[in-house]
Design a protein with these regions (language model features):
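Core segments of cupin and vicinal oxygen chelate
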Residues: 12-54
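Short amphipathic alpha-helices within nucleic acid-binding modules
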Residues: 22, 86-91
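A short, acidic/glycine-rich surface segment
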Residues: 32-34, 41-43, 62-68, 101
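Exposed loop/turn and edge beta-strand positions of beta-sandwich/beta-sheet ligand-binding modules
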Residues: 41, 74, 109
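Mid-chain, well-packed structural core segment of small domains
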Residues: 71-86
Length: 127
């Protein structure tokens, strides 16, 4: 078996336009395609993260809220590798996105921090 890369990650959002604005205009991902699927009554937005990875956004009517405390099984957070955590945090803050203080990962010794998407999904920056 050769699982060589992560092709895509799919998340469900409560507000399509807010999620699209966040991931495209604030994080800079490019739109591959977007479709309204009337049979499912939802939007599907495919975004290019980099040459190897895509992010799928599904916007459904009234999805249940994300469980943060206590944490539930499933995706805990989504982490993005960056060259400079400080520079990326600066750019995010200039876009109105709050970030936690930068800290050093106890295991890797690398700088990292967290912020959240509009639905509260924790997103990590890691050098």
């Amino acid at each position: 078996m050769n699982l060589s890369k992560i092709h895509h990650i799919a998340i469900i959002v409560s507000d399509y336009e807010a999620a699209k604005d966040f991931y495209v205009n604030k994080l800079g991902f490019s739109v591959i395609r977007e479709n309204y699927r009337p049979e499912r009554k939802d939007w599907k937005l495919d975004l290019r993260v980099n040459e190897h990875t895509e992010l799928e956004i599904f916007a459904e009517e009234n999805p249940p809220k994300r469980v943060n405390r206590p944490e539930a099984c499933g995706l805990r957070h989504l982490a993005f590798g960056v060259d400079s955590v400080e520079q990326t945090v600066k750019e995010l803050r200039e876009s109105g996105i709050e970030c936690e203080p930068v800290r050093v990962d106890d295991y890797t010794g690398k700088k990292m921090t967290f912020f959240h998407d509009p639905d509260g999904l924790p997103l990590e920056l890691h050098e």
